[in-house]
C-alpha cells in the first residue's frame, strides 16, 4: 500500500509517468510496436510466474481454478497484443504452431488456443475424468480437439482450393433449375403450414394480416403505435398487480 501511495504521489508531482508503468487496458490504442513488445513481454512473465505457482501442492482446488482462469485470461491478453503488433506491421508471433514460450524462451505446456488447463488444474475433479475418458478413446484432449475443429470450420480457408461457387457466386441460377426447385419447396412449405390445425397455435397468438386470407397486406407498426402498445402492456401489468 505504501509503495502504491508513493507511486501515485510521484505521478501527481510529475516525477514519473504512471501511464508507462501500468499496462493499458485498451490494447488497440497503443500505436508503437516497441511498447506493444514491452507489454507482451510483461504478460509472458506473468504467465510464466503463474504457471510455476499452479504446480504448488499447497494450493486448494479453488485457488487452482482461480489461477487457471487467470492464466487463460492472460493468454487472451497475450493474443491481443500479438494481434496489435501484427496489425502495426511488426513480427507475426501467431505464425507457426500453437506453442507458447515465455520471455526466456521456455515452452509453456498447454499454452495453445482455446481454454486450457495448466499444471495441477489437470487433476481437478471433473477435469481429470475428462482427460482420462479422452485417453481411453484414444483421442486427444478435448481442448486440442476444439482447436482442430476451429480450423475445420473455415479458420484455414486461405489454404483451401475453393472457387466462386463456394461463396455463392456460381452459375446455378442461370438455367433456372435452382429457382424452380426453390419455388417448389416454398410452395410445399406454405401448403404444409396452411394444413396445420388452428389448435396448434399457442394461446394469445394472432395470424398476421394477409396470412388469414383477409386480403390485408402486412405492414410495420409506427413508432407511436409501438410506444402506445408498450404503455398499454405496462398499465395492464400494474393493474394486475394491484388487483
From Swiss-Prot:
Keyword Transport: no
Subcellular location: Cytoplasm; Nucleus
GO biological process: generation of catalytic spliceosome for second transesterification step; mRNA 3'-splice site recognition
Region ranges (Disordered): 133-157, 191-216
SUPFAM superfamilies membership: ISY1 domain-like
Pfam families: Isy1
Protein keywords: Cytoplasm, mRNA processing, mRNA splicing, Nucleus, Spliceosome
Entry GO CC: catalytic step 2 spliceosome; cytoplasm; post-mRNA release spliceosomal complex; post-spliceosomal complex; Prp19 complex
Main localization, broad class: cytoplasm
Highest taxon of the lineage: Eukaryota
Function according to Swiss-Prot or TrEMBL: Involved in pre-mRNA splicing.
Subunit and partners: Associated with the spliceosome.
Family statement: Belongs to the ISY1 family.
UniProt protein name: Pre-mRNA-splicing factor isy1
